[in-house]
Structures are given as structure tokens and as C-alpha cells.
């Protein structure tokens, strides 16, 4: 069964983690417009050359070019590969364009899954995280400190780092931006009855189980 899904969630909700698990466990492919754009420009595809010319001129890439990128990538993958859309669509016009792109290839949008988070809890989750500067092992001030203070459990390094944008102001600004971006498209998909919300603050395995159940891929 080929699935076409949109996975929504603000930064820090665990969207990337869940998309990666679906890729690893079910062979699904995550379609990130940013990644596709960079890949097309690097490969010098017809759409990529169009996009490069626009960006070199300091202009925003049009919906038509983004739609072309998605169509190009779906054609590369073929009809039997399930896909996860990330960062697209963000407007009603893009949602309409996506319908056309999928329909032209015998596909339909099956599910829109939103990872819902509590804003205060998300601030706590993000502002407390840090990682080993050498191996990248992740830690948290409240939930996962190194077993021996200031020494990485995995590689023994004493050097740790935090992302410069892991601060409360940035997190709350991103939440506002996320709501603004999803506001135009959620009602469209809710009217079709294909939106399901999952508690993004639950443990990773539980979130994955909920998504698997929605998609019918559990077990």
C-alpha cells in the first residue's frame, strides 16, 4: 500500500525523529522542499536551474518551481514509494497544487498528522538540551544528565555544547510562526476528515506507535 502523508509539528516536536523512523522501518521517503531544492540546484536539473536563476537574483522561489520540484522527485521515486511531505504545503494555493501533482501521478493524500505540543513543556524540552561536542550524544538538564557529571557516557569527552537558538524567545517565536503557517491549510484537510492529532510530548516510542496505528502499518 502506497501512502502519501503530511507530517506537521513545530520545531522540537519530534517530527524529524518520527519521519526518520518511518523511512527506516517502512521505506518511506521524506520530501523536504528545502532539501529537494538544494539537490536539484546541485544536480543541475531543469527545475534546479530555474530555481538557481531565481535565487541568484535574490528573489523567492515561486510555487510553480516548488511544485515542479515535487513532481520531479515523485517521478524519480516511481508510483510504489510512500512519501512524507515536510514543510509543504504552507498555503491554500500550495495545498491545491499538491492535489494536482498527486492526482496526475495516480496518488491521493491519505493522512495529515499533526504532532501537538504544550508550548511551556516544549520550551523546557528544548532549552534544557545539550550534546557531547565530540560524538553528538544528546543530554538534558532535567531528564538525561551524564551518569558521571560532566563526562559523556558514550565517548568519555568532557566537552559539551548547546545550540545557540535553543532559548525561550526563539522557541516561542517559532511556535507563533508555525501556527501562522499551518492555519491556512489545516481547515482544508480537516474538511476532508484526514487530519489526526498525536501528542508530540509523549515518549518517542509511544508517538511512533500512534502514527503506525493511524497509517495502518503497526505490526
UniProtKB/Swiss-Prot annotation:
Q: Please give the family membership noted in the entry.
A: Belongs to the adenylate kinase family.
Look up the record and give one Gene Ontology term from the biological process aspect.
AMP salvage
UniProt cross-references to InterPro entries, sorted A to Z = Adenyl_kin_sub, Adenylat/UMP-CMP_kin, Adenylat_kinase_CS, Adenylate_kinase_lid-dom, P-loop_NTPase
> Which gene does this sequence derive from?
adk
Query: What is said about its interaction partners and assembly?
Result: Monomer.
Recorded hits in HAMAP family, A to Z, give:
Adenylate_kinase_Adk
Q: Output this protein's name.
A: Adenylate kinase
Of the GO CC terms on this record, one is: cytoplasm
Which CDD domains does this one have? Answer: ADK
Residue ranges for the region (NMP) are 32-61
Positions contributing to AMP binding: 33, 38, 59-61, 87-90, 94, 162, 174
Q: Which Pfam families match?
A: ADK, ADK_lid
Species assigned in the record: Sphingopyxis alaskensis (strain DSM 13593 / LMG 18877 / RB2256)
